[in-house]
Amino acid sequence: MAGATVTVEEVRKAQRATGPATVLAIGTATPANCVHQADYPDYYFRITKSEHMTELKEKFKRMCDKSQIRKRYMHLTEEYLAENPNMCAYMAPSLDARQDIVVVEVPKLGKAAAQKAIKEWGQPKSKITHLVFCTTSGVDMPGADYQLTKMLGLRPSVNRLMMYQQGCFAGGTVLRVAKDLAENNRGARVLVVCSEITAVTFRGPSESHLDSMVGQALFGDGAAAVIVGADPDERVERPLFQLVSASQTILPDSEGAIDGHLREVGLTFHLLKDVPGLISKNIERSLEEAFKPLGITDYNSIFWVAHPGGPAILDQVEAKVGLEKERMRATRHVLSEYGNMSSACVLFILDEMRKRSAEDGRATTGEGFEWGVLFGFGPGLTVETVVLHSVPITTGAAITA
């Protein structure tokens, strides 16, 4: 038998990219139906036929007032809920009705975001080699990744990964996975899509489960897409952020802090009060592990993209780390304008940050800073930490130290 003309090492080297994975485009989408937070308690208690629960409604109103959310977008309309009263009860069998919505609408909303990202990227869809699709909303086979491949007209040979039931940390997870795919497959262009619809979690109020009502006050619908690739061709591709490192960890003593369970009644949501405390208590360790190798100890000298699980989490992280209010501006803006869209949030924040940085004449896509951090927080308690490197917006502009 003739000897091989190349070695495994040579093959491996040829397969791998030279530079770091880079975000090349971002697109976002929401349903048309906009819900204003100030009006939501009246609407929510009316549509769920719970107006007799006056004290509970007052509690819910206070939750909405404290949420720092101005508006959210929701696929579920009053008409649809009126036709499906089981979805408005706290615990009534309704999974079929919920699945009927999300199986169709999750890929459809993902398509809207993906089309915007592909348009900004400016390259043919045939150059997309990988698809990573993430949703906490429903499960199906073949999955939303398959449906989106068909809807967009991607190549049948695109390498797909479907991530179901991850939760709010998964905006970091998809970037971590996309980084590995892009850097280990020379020439790869990874389409990442997070699409979330609250039809699986919407339910009526319960006096014995206030944690469920917290979710009803916070969650909104949205989809975000990014194109990730290494070694960008800067004649036709415009880098936005480099993905420098990515890691995941389970916080100590946090089991049961955030849970979701798929049942006949839909996806139930369970939350312990000390979630903000657990996250803030451990945030410095995550920052040290990520930034010590870079010689960075001043966390006001980096840009911040933090999953806005709720205002209490952001407040306690700011206090623990000693952050200036401006560091969380983009994060709080997305929370205010869209609510908590689970995995899609951090990608919305990246989009807001790069756009606002350009509008404000900042030197880089990261509010003028060179380095940044992206955090995902969710069930586990699981934390995703992604170190980002911005790119200059104007050639020769100084980067804020």
From Swiss-Prot:
Entry EC no(s): 2.3.1.74
- Enumerate the GO terms in the molecular function aspect: naringenin-chalcone synthase activity
Q: Which domain of life is it from?
A: Eukaryota
| Annotated pathway | Secondary metabolite biosynthesis; flavonoid biosynthesis
Pfam families, alphabetically?
Chal_sti_synt_C, Chal_sti_synt_N
Q: Which reaction does it catalyse?
A: (E)-4-coumaroyl-CoA + 3 malonyl-CoA + 3 H(+) = 2',4,4',6'-tetrahydroxychalcone + 3 CO2 + 4 CoA
Keywords attached to this Swiss-Prot or TrEMBL record, sorted alphabetically, are: Acyltransferase, Flavonoid biosynthesis, Transferase
Q: Where is the active site?
A: C168
Q: Which residues form the signal peptide?
A: none
**GO process terms (BP):** flavonoid biosynthetic process
Q: Which PROSITE patterns match?
A: CHALCONE_SYNTH
**Enzymatic class:** transferase
Q: What does this protein do?
A: The primary product of this enzyme is 4,2',4',6'-tetrahydroxychalcone (also termed naringenin-chalcone or chalcone) which can under specific conditions spontaneously isomerize into naringenin.
Family stated for the protein in its record: Belongs to the thiolase-like superfamily. Chalcone/stilbene synthases family.
Q: What is this protein called?
A: Chalcone synthase 2
In the UniProt record, what gene is named as encoding this protein?
CHS2
